[in-house]
């Protein structure tokens, strides 16, 4: 049988806006012989398992004529059948790939990722013939799926919200668990799988079924307090049924659903189905509205006797229990619309504006620059970057969360009003996006890094990163000096594309993007100074390069580029030049602000620079920067080579660093399981030797702390000591060791050469 792999997305992703399972199939020539294109055995298996009726159409869509397409389409349609028979409302799928190729892929909609994944597994076993008796397995699957079923009314609210552009986040789906919201629910569960957040930040409301959890605590108590509800009814002035008649008696009872002060549906109690309310007695309507008004016009089901007396009300009505047919789905939609009206009224800004950043190098520095500009403009930005998650000025996480989980910490926080979200390729590839669109997106660079089994080429990496830029609405900001960024332009739909270049002129860039929508950010001489200048509909000089401390007078050309990307993004985000200039003049590359990125320490007689460059492009940029630093002494480097990269990558790091330093200490950052620890340093050494660096100028050291201490003891007055540790913990460890070092004039260490 073909080799089949599948992987779920629960949020908008690089492939689709829906939650989907991505299925990849690798076929062998023998598969076509083993599995003739005959649907009859599969259908018989489904009928015998009680899943299909004899007269039921299956598959729903015609199967392709080629074998790989036939097999893939049948697999996906079978998995969809299992889900829909278990009550999950799914139907979308697509099959991709060339019939002449041995690899095919498909996307299949799911309502809950574990159910979707299990459905694919069961479909795979069914089509391969591994399972011929399906009754028991499907019974188990169905029970599993029903337990994770999205309530119909919750689904209706989600659909209404998304049509209006209101974010809808299901809080019982990955990456969340209901228990995380016990502070809202009190540990109670009103509707299983019905916990839902609508809106971002301060605009958010949380629903459990149709009940709004951010309503007053008094209303929450009424959910389980029958006498309290009765007391409230009596306080409204409506006629209230005697306590002896509220649970029976000869009078017929009706329940009326009101949402936002409108009667939406009615049904006979206890077992009638919801239907249009029809013509109601004026007095009954008045009584219903009095109750709804007392409850703030939320969703409420009011039970009334035929004589007009009110029996009780339910603040968390369940509409799905009494829907007789699909015709009544219109009632759900109307209820959903009215509930969203009640929550948000005419408010348009239910979303938190987002600037999203990706790229191989420079994305964290650029994200931090953007955050600084937003803060200078008086906003309260939330930031997600490699160093952690920040809500306004407070760091709430110190780990890399540049993916959905970290992004949601910002988007769901009422402490911030703008989101600056760094996204690395792993987050995009494996998880998708916490938003369906952003205002501005940036791609700083695409270069050789993180290539291997999943992403094999730089071109494939560019396509993954491009998925973020494709979600930009107002502007996409791209590095025109990087060919892979430039290739993205034709795929983008943002209102404007801004091309950033440290070397090209505006006239040349204006012809490289979509006609009428291309802007640029370039360097131009103004009064004999290099300025960052934006060309939109007008020419806008923003800030002199020399006024931005992060550029080190323009010597850190990569930071000039990072700054230009941040400036352009904030300009098209709507910030004025004064705020942008103030932010960039205030932004500095110290360890507290940009840990591991061009951090200088000048307390000793020698200068110390730490930069956690991580790939050949970063190494080359660091080398060019160091070359421009004039010293009275020598230049030394300690580099942590990445042992979790292939030989070519590691040697390219060494080649990029050759010729810039008087001595090299090579150490390793991380290794493949089973690999010798000295593999990466030895490869760097080999590359340095090939580039003409003398062997006496290269030292290999196994221990990081020893390597740092050795280099510090090599330093003398006027020297420059450069530390290039790995990202994550190593940079913090190295910086702490640098600060704790006690300089001694005759410390020794390796012989100073």
Question: Model-predicted segments: where are they?
Answer:
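Adenine nucleotide phosphate-binding catalytic loops in nucleotide-utilizing enzymes
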Residues: 294, 455-459, 495-620
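Conserved N-proximal alpha/beta basic substrate-recognition cap immediately N-terminal to
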Residues: 107-243
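ATP-dependent carboxylate-amine ligase
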Residues: 2-63, 355, 553-556, 568-578, ...
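Active-site nucleotide/adenylate-binding loops and adjacent lid/helix of ATP-dependent enzymes
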Residues: 199-273, 281-286, 290, 335-336
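ATP-dependent carboxylate activation and anion-phosphoryl transfer catalytic cores
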Residues: 1-162, 259-262, 276-358
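Flexible active-site lid/hinge loop adjacent to a nucleotide/diphosphate
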Residues: 395-512, 616
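Walker A (P-loop) phosphate-binding motif
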Residues: 210-211, 346-388
């Amino acid at each position: 049988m073909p080799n089949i792999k599948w992987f779920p997305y629960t949020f908008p992703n690089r492939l689709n806006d829906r939650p989907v399972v991505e299925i990849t199939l690798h076929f062998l020539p023998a598969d076509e012989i083993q599995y003739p294109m005959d649907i009859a055995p599969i259908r018989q298996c489904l009928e015998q398992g009680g899943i299909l009726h004899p007269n039921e159409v299956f598959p729903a869509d015609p199967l392709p004529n080629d074998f790989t397409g036939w097999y893939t389409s049948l697999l996906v349609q079978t998995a969809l059948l299992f889900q829909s028979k278990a009550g999950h409302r799914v139907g979308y799928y697509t099959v991709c790939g060339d019939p002449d190729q041995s690899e095919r892929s498909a996307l299949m909609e799911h309502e809950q990722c574990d159910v979707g994944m299990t459905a694919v597994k069961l479909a795979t076993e069914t089509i391969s013939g591994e399972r011929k008796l399906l009754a028991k397995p499907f019974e188990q699957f169905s029970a599993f799926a029903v337990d994770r079923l999205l309530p119909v009314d919750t689904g209706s609210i989600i659909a209404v919200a998304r049509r209006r552009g209101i974010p809808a986040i299901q809080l019982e789906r990955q990456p969340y668990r209901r228990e995380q919201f016990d502070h809202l629910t009190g540990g109670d569960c009103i509707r299983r799988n019905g916990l839902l957040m609508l809106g971002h930040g301060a605009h958010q409301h949380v629903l459990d079924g149709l009940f709004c959890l951010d309503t007053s605590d008094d209303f929450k108590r009424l959910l389980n307090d029958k006498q309290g509800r009765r007391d409230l009814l009596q306080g409204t002035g409506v006629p209230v049924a005697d306590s002896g008649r509220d649970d029976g008696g000869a009078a017929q009872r009706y329940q009326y659903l009101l949402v936002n002060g409108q009667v939406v549906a009615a049904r006979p109690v206890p077992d009638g189905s919801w239907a249009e309310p029809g013509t109601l007695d004026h007095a009954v309507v008045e009584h219903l509205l009095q109750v709804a008004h007392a409850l703030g016009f939320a969703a409420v089901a009011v039970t009334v006797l035929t004589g007009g007396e009110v029996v009780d009300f339910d603040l968390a009505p369940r509409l799905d229990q009494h829907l007789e047919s699909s015709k009544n789905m219109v009632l759900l939609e109307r209820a959903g619309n009215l509930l969203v009206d009640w929550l948000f009224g005419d408010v348009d800004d239910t979303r938190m504006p987002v600037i999203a950043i990706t790229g191989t190098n420079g994305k964290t520095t650029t994200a931090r620059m953007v955050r600084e500009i937003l803060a200078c403009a008086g906003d309260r930005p939330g930031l997600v970057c490699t160093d952690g998650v920040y809500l306004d000025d407070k760091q709430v996480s110190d780990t890399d969360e540049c993916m959905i989980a970290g992004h949601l910490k910002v988007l769901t926080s009422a402490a911030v009003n703008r989101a600056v979200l760094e996204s690395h390729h792993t987050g995009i590839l494996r998880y998708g996006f916490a938003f369906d669109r952003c205002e501005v997106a940036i791609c700083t660079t695409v270069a050789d890094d993180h290539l291997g089994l999943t992403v094999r080429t730089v071109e494939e990496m560019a396509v993954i990163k491009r998925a973020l830029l494709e979600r930009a609405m107002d502007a996409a900001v791209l590095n025109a000096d990087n060919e892979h960024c430039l290739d993205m332009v034709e795929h983008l739909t943002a209102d404007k594309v801004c091309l950033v270049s440290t070397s090209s002129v505006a006239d040349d860039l204006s012809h490289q993007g979509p006609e009428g929508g291309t802007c640029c950010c370039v360097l131009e001489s103004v009064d004999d100074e290099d300025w960052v200048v934006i060309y939109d509909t007008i020419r806008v000089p923003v800030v002199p390069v020399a006024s931005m401390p992060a550029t080190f007078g323009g010597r850190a050309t990569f930071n000039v580029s990072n700054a230009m990307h941040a400036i352009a993004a904030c300009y098209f985000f709507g910030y004025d030049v004064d705020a942008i200039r103030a932010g960039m003049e205030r932004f500095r590359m110290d360890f507290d602000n940009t840990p591991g990125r061009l951090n200088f320490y000048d307390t000793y007689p020698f200068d110390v620079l730490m930069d956690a460059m991580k790939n050949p492009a970063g190494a080359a940029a660091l080398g060019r920067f160091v070359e421009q630093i004039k010293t009275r002494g020598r230049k030394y480097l300690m580099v942590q080579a990445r042992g979790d990269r292939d030989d070519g990558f590691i040697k390219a790091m060494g080649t990029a660093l050759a010729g810039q330093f008087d001595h090299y200490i090579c150490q390793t950052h991380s290794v493949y399981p089973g690999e010798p620890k000295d593999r990466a340093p030895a490869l760097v050494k080999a590359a340095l030797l090939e580039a003409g660096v003398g062997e006496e100028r290269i030292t290999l050291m196994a221990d990081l702390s020893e390597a740092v201490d050795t280099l510090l003891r090599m330093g003398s007055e006027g020297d420059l000591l450069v530390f290039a540790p790995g990202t994550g913990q190593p940079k913090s460890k190295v910086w702490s060791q640098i600060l704790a070092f006690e300089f001694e004039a005759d410390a020794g260490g390796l012989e100073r050469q």
